[in-house]
A protein has these predicted regions:
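Surface-exposed patches in mature extracellular/periplasmic domains of secreted proteins
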Residues: 58-64, 150-157
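Solvent-exposed loop/turn segments at secondary-structure junctions
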Residues: 2-5, 15-19, 70-74, 114-119, ...
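Acidic/histidine-rich catalytic neighborhood of metal-dependent amide-processing enzymes
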Residues: 31-134, 163
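Structural element of the ATP-grasp superfamily
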Residues: 47, 139, 166-167
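Soluble metallo-hydrolase cores and metallopeptidase-like ectodomains found primarily
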Residues: 1-33, 52, 56
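Zn-dependent metallopeptidase/amidohydrolase metal-coordination segment
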Residues: 154-168
């Protein structure tokens, strides 16, 4: 949105889902794919809705909506080799090295992942809170002001390897 505007934010989500259910309690499902309605599709759905609203609201800043792939690839739990962080977030790793515009720099970015779970609760993710605490505070305060405070809990959560890990 507004590609010529210098003042930009980036919104991210991944559209893939885990190719196998290796953490499922039922071992028979360990080599079947995950459906991905929450982990994959929910963030994409929210960003598509944001894009629809951008046509009406016309914010002053530029907004880049980025869909990445292979966030959930990783290695299967049965794999006997090393389980490395860089096996995850393949699309975001690629995008971080090859942004859509040379020298791209957003003021901040927001990753939407697993936002469609029943009774979802969002806490400050550790890396995000370390790198951009002011952005976290703004998002959580805005959510609270809009009546969504029960979902955006103002407490620290843990560290999560996700697309933001590689983009930060």
């Amino acid at each position: 949105y507004k590609p010529d505007t210098k003042k930009r934010i980036a919104l991210f989500s991944h559209w893939d889902s885990r190719p196998w259910a290796d953490a499922d309690p039922d071992a028979k499902k360990h080599y079947t794919p995950i459906l991905g309605a929450n982990d994959g599709a929910s963030g994409v759905g929210v960003l598509l809705e944001i894009a629809r609203h951008l046509q009406k609201q016309l914010p002053e800043m530029g907004i880049d909506i980025v869909f990445v792939d292979a966030e959930d690839y990783g290695t299967h739990q049965a794999y006997n080799g090393p389980h490395k962080e860089e096996y995850w977030g393949l699309g975001s790793q690629y995008w971080a090295r090859n942004p859509h515009v040379q020298g791209y720099n957003a003021r901040f970015g927001i990753l939407l992942d697993m936002v469609g779970g029943k009774n979802a609760e969002f806490r400050y993710e550790s890396l995000s809170h370390e790198v951009a605490p002011n952005v976290n505070e703004k998002v959580w305060k805005t959510a609270n002001a809009l009546g969504f405070g029960r979902y955006f809990v103002q407490k620290k959560g843990g560290f999560v390897t996700d697309d933001h890990t590689f983009i930060n």
